[in-house]
Amino acid sequence: MSHYDLILRNGNVVCPDGVRKADIAVSDGKIVLIAEEIPGDAKEVIDAAGKHVFPGITDGHVHFNDPGRTEWETISTGSSALAAGGGVAYFDMPLNCSPCTLDAVNFNNKLAVAQKDSLVDYGFWGGLTSANLDKLDELAECGVIGFKAFACHSGIDEFPRMDDYTALVGMEKLAKLGLPLMVHCENAEITKELTELSLANNRTGVRDYFAARPPITEIENVSRMITFAEETGCKLIIAHISTAKAVDLVAQARARGVDVYCETIGHYLYLTGDDVERLGTVAKCSPPIRDGENQLQMWGRLFNDNIAFVSSDHSPCDPKLKNGEFMRVWGGISACQTTLQGLLTHAYHDRKFPLVKIAQLTAQHVNEIFKIKGKGQINLGYDADFALVDLNHEFTLQAEDLFYKHKVSPYVGDRFRGSVSQTILRGTTIYKDGKIVSQPIGKHLRPHQ
């Protein structure tokens, strides 16, 4: 009789304290032994020789648009794409599904879809808007991992921005609930006026868009949100931080004891404004991609541990919504399949960024911050979530490689070094050699209180 359900043998295992060659034994979906050599047999044995075994990534920021906007993306296609990139879990945003996740009814509607269709594990953000302050308690009871708010227009009329009163009262409530708030930080008045002025003068190109959302709009708003968090005691996460100066504000606040973190997104590390001019609307996002000097500074902040985690901000749409003048088209980038490969290429190979830190940025920290118990690292008692990686395999991303509903991404045609050959969720292989090999087995993740 097999002693274990699964043994991974001979892998280079990316543990929290370093990379070491080891075997990993799994029973009942959990890691039960990590040793240089594990004797005996198992129901399944995987030879990971020559591979690096990473903890499966958790993407803290995706828009899978389900239910209600399934012509853009679905939980089925989005979670499959995530698995193909080494992903085992995601936290889905309260928009751009329709209706938005602003109360228990719509939370449960989304949960029902995920229970049926999600290949990987999932958590859900609740929304905080000026219209649903009375719904925060019921969303907390549903098990949201936190709340998301926009300081500027969200792009979705049914998800109104958080004004200052909502910020104050909402953060006071969330502090009592013990749940974090993530804020999209851009100054509403400045972005609105600059955008309207640009459109009135028929300035609708790439650089016009950048000029309408300059760095100060993020920097100023990050400073203000930190002040609200400091006064209320609410845990704050700055979403998709794009400027090094804003990262510095977060680091300074943390140094004085404020419970604040920031996430960044791959495109702020890999792309510059020049790339956006070349790529066009497929690379439009908000906040916009910045210049090369800021990008270099962002890498410095990553090396200095001032950025807590890296997500994809996967925000697809119907490709028709990307047709037209840059200023007017939908802003959002499809990227959840390439987060780990991007970091292996641009961080590890190009900049000698440690593999352990990549695992922290994509798996460990996000689960710790959101209090997801037993997930995010290769350690005893944790979920047996693994991404098997060939560090030196080079490939050019093709549209047909993508599992998204629409085979669109600014990274199509890019050369990557470091590929995912197999993804394992709680001991079950869900992706292998370019194919999804499992039925949906995702489970709902709730914060551990």
Swiss-Prot record:
E.C. number(s) listed in UniProt: 3.5.2.5
Keyword Metal-binding in annotation: yes
SUPFAM superfamilies: Composite domain of metallo-dependent hydrolases, Metallo-dependent hydrolases
This protein's pathway: Nitrogen metabolism; (S)-allantoin degradation; allantoate from (S)-allantoin: step 1/1
GO molecular function, one term: allantoinase activity
Similarity section: Belongs to the metallo-dependent hydrolases superfamily. Allantoinase family.
InterPro entries: Allantoinase (IPR017593), Allantoinase_bact (IPR047604), Amidohydro-rel (IPR006680), DHOase/Allantoinase_Hydrolase (IPR050138), Metal-dep_hydrolase_composite (IPR011059), Metal_Hydrolase (IPR032466)
Keyword Transferase on entry: no
Any GO BP annotation: purine nucleobase catabolic process
Pfam family, one: Amidohydro_1
CDD domains per UniProt: L-HYD_ALN
UniProt: Zn(2+) 2 binding residues: 148, 184, 240
Catalytic activity: (S)-allantoin + H2O = allantoate + H(+)
A GO-annotated cellular component: cytoplasm
S-S bridge residues: none
Post-translational modification: Carboxylation allows a single lysine to coordinate two zinc ions.
Lineage: Bacteria, Bacillati, Bacillota, Clostridia, Eubacteriales
Residue sites binding Zn(2+) 1 per the record: 61, 63, 148, 313
Cofactor(s) the protein requires to work: Zn(2+)
Cofactor, free-text remark: Binds 2 Zn(2+) ions per subunit.
Protein name as annotated: Allantoinase
Function: Catalyzes the conversion of allantoin (5-ureidohydantoin) to allantoic acid by hydrolytic cleavage of the five-member hydantoin ring.
Top EC class, one word: hydrolase
